[in-house]
Amino acid sequence: MKPDYKNWIPKGMMFSLIAGTALSLALLLVFGVFGIEVGGKLRVVLGVVFGVAFVVCAKYTQWCVYAYRSFSYDGERKLSKQIIDGTAEHITLPEGGVGLDIGCGSGALTIACAKRNPQGKMVGIDRWGKEYASFSLPLCEKNAAAEGVENASFRRGNALKLDFPDESFDAVTSNYVYHNITGADKQALLLETLRILKKGGTFAIHDLMSPGRYGDMQAFVQKLRDMGYERVELMDTTDGSFMTPKEAKRLMLRGSTLLVGRK
């Protein structure tokens, strides 16, 4: 059985854009070009409206197809896999230790960390909202079974308020989650995540950490150091480590940064 981690670009969105492009082109030809049953100013107006709609839909369809192919686990680029594996490399569990993946989606990062740390266990949590309907708890469990991973489990949880006591886990990780939580203070989310990390535990949090979303992250790094964290580092993953600057720009992933270290 092969795991199905799903694409970060939902098929439904891509097919909707393709359908919208085809429909707007058909309407442009019928009313704007051939002027079937319309004429004069109305023909011109409809031609402009459907022409603009076609150009916009075609542009977004082109981007969507490119992004889908880039992220696909079955494609040549496999960018999602590179990001997941690259993030998992920074998670280390002690013998019998437990790590937490926040916003686990289809379970890819949870499972990757579990495979790298057979001496411990990984827990993946997510609220599995309607906006990401292709991700689910049963899907995560199926993927773990497909990978032959027995040291990973999944449950519902909310990144805004983690239902765990302080210093509960030996490692915490997350990938492209917090930027999706609108209205939340991103640095506060990071502190909430690190609250449940044990002293000496490792962390690797990957997200779009642009100043507009996260504020001054260099100051945040210094804050953690002042709090006694053993090691804290910000890594720009658009420098070729995960993706090239060109890919980051085309895929709207500029600002991709990995916050790693040890508490």
What residues fall within each predicted segment?
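Class I SAM-dependent methyltransferase Rossmann-like catalytic core
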Residues: 12-16, 62-83
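Conserved alpha-helix/loop element of class I SAM-dependent methyltransferases that forms part
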Residues: 78-96
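Conserved SAM-binding loop of SAM-dependent methyltransferases across substrates and taxa
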Residues: 106-118
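Conserved beta-strand signature within the Rossmann-like core of class I S-adenosyl-L-methionine
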Residues: 200-207
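Core SAM-dependent methyltransferase catalytic element
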Residues: 228, 241-263
